[in-house]
Amino acid sequence: GPIPWQR
């Protein structure tokens, strides 16, 4: 995903 911790 757009956020590293929200892959």
Curated annotation (Swiss-Prot):
Coiled-coil boundaries:
none
Q: Which is a GO BP term held by this UniProt record? A: defense response
Tissues in which the protein is found: Expressed by the skin glands.
Which cellular component, as a GO term, is one annotated location? extracellular region
Keywords (A to Z) from UniProt: Amphibian defense peptide, Secreted
Q: Does the keyword Secreted apply?
A: yes
Major location category of this protein: secreted
| Domain of life where this protein originates | Eukaryota
Keyword Secreted (UniProt): yes
* Subcellular location per the Swiss-Prot or TrEMBL entry: Secreted
Function, as annotated: Putative defense peptide.
- Give the family per the record: Belongs to the frog skin active peptide (FSAP) family. Tryptophillin subfamily.
Protein name (database record): Tryptophyllin-1
Organism of this sequence: Ascaphus truei
